[in-house]
Amino acid sequence: ACPFAAKWRKDGKLRIEVRSDKSKYEKHLTSLLKDWNKKKHDIIIFCDPYYDQYSLEQFQEKIDFYNKTYNRRDVYFMGFHPDNPASVEEQEFLVEPTDDTTYDNPIPYSMMLIQKFKQLYEASCKLHKIGYYKKWPPEYYEEVVATRQKTYEKLFKKGVTS
């Protein structure tokens, strides 16, 4: 639950797309990327109800491939797969970050979040300063946030480390 998400949605900066058929996943995603107006939308969420066509491992390979290909173009990819849901025990801060009633989606789907890398880096720096990540398990923080921040710094801030 990103604290910036509600503002992006309210400001119309969030684009949500759903894979409409079972044709090749990469074809849909690449088409979205080519069509992305970065001045209009800060983030794209690509939902895929046909996620059963690929395993969790294959999905992670897609994320890694797109990051390797697009990070240098100031684009970062994150994904969520129904076969690896956030659990209360491991990631309570993600499952119920505000203690609100959790909405249970009857139609499972994978989700690829595509965002401007610089914007994500800067937002993450702000969140770090206000203590947002303090409740995160250290291993999860390292895997998700610290690694991403180091990648950005390596690509765009030569000689700077977090």
Predicted regions and their residues:
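Expand to "…catalyze enediolate/carbanion chemistry for C-C bond making/breaking, isomerization
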Residues: 1-162
